[in-house]
From Swiss-Prot:
This is UPF0246 protein PEPE_1842. It comes from Pediococcus pentosaceus (strain ATCC 25745 / CCUG 21536 / LMG 10740 / 183-1w). HAMAP family: UPF0246 (MF_00652). One of its GO terms (cellular component) is cytosol. It comes from the Bacteria.
Length: 251
């Protein structure tokens, strides 16, 4: 079983907490993307990144000196976001860290797919970015088949804790006997399940932590997840979707 999550836009260099023990699987492809990005003008990159002048300037300067093998931070510590805070890898035991290294995969527009202890550098490139690589019109097309092969090689089940932007890179390649179970963390509003961005990120991080703590081996075990006052709702779930609803009293 594999677990997929999305990266965070904000990143940091942290070479002290943990050592980077592995290298990204698709580093050759990442180097190709990096080379292409370095050939773009500042204006082209700003348009690609869809960000403010301040962020564009920061990332443009960072890009010019980017070295994929220097000052590496384990992926699990490199991303700074709500999901990663709630995952709390810095508080995990050796056994829990070994679990996420084996099962957790971070999907990335720049690196493709990452294990938690793959050594990476800060970058800015979302999966939805319209960067043409080889004969592909965008990163989703460029990475899609590679992500699928990586996730489903010798494995038929994936727990999807990623955002739709990243999930849709993999989904078109699913075969009939492949299973992707999406976890929805929501609340009932006007009789319908509504998933809000921030609470969902919190819950996804907690779910990864929960799975590592309990060494979860199959999706049935996820039904007991009750953190942040969520509870599994079988009546709202389906074969490929597990719905967790926040308790009315704790919204």
């Amino acid at each position: 079983m594999k677990i997929i999550i999305a990266p965070a836009k904000k990143m940091q260099v942290d070479t002290d907490s943990f050592d980077a023990t592995t290298m990204p699987v698709y580093l050759k492809q990442t180097q190709k993307i990096l080379t292409m990005m370095k050939q773009l003008t500042y204006s082209d990159l700003k348009m690609l990144w869809k960000c403010s002048d301040k962020l564009a300037q920061l990332n443009y300067e960072r890009l010019q000196g980017l070295d994929l093998k220097y000052q590496l931070t384990p992926a699990i510590m490199a991303y700074v976001g709500i999901q990663y805070q709630y995952m709390a890898p810095d508080l995990m035991t050796e056994k829990q860290l070994a679990y996420i290294q084996e099962h957790l995969r971070i999907l990335s527009g720049f690196y493709g797919v990452l294990r938690p202890f793959d050594g990476i550098v800060p970058y800015r490139l979302e999966m939805q970015a319209k960067l043409k690589i080889d004969n592909y019109n965008n990163l989703c097309q460029f990475w899609g088949a590679k992500l699928y092969q990586n996730l489903y090689k010798d494995n038929r089940a994936v727990v999807n804790l990623a955002s739709k932007e990243y999930e849709k890179a993999v989904r078109p390649f699913l075969q009939e006997d492949d299973k992707m179970t999406t976890c929805i963390f929501g609340e009932i509003i006007d009789g319908k399940v509504k998933q809000k961005a921030t609470p969902a990120k919190e819950a996804r991080g907690e779910m990864v932590n929960f799975m590592a703590l309990n060494q979860v081996k199959n999706t049935k075990e996820l039904k007991s997840f009750d953190r942040l006052n969520y509870a599994y709702r079988a009546d709202l779930s389906s074969a490929d979707k597990m719905v967790f609803i926040k308790n009315e009293l704790h919204k």
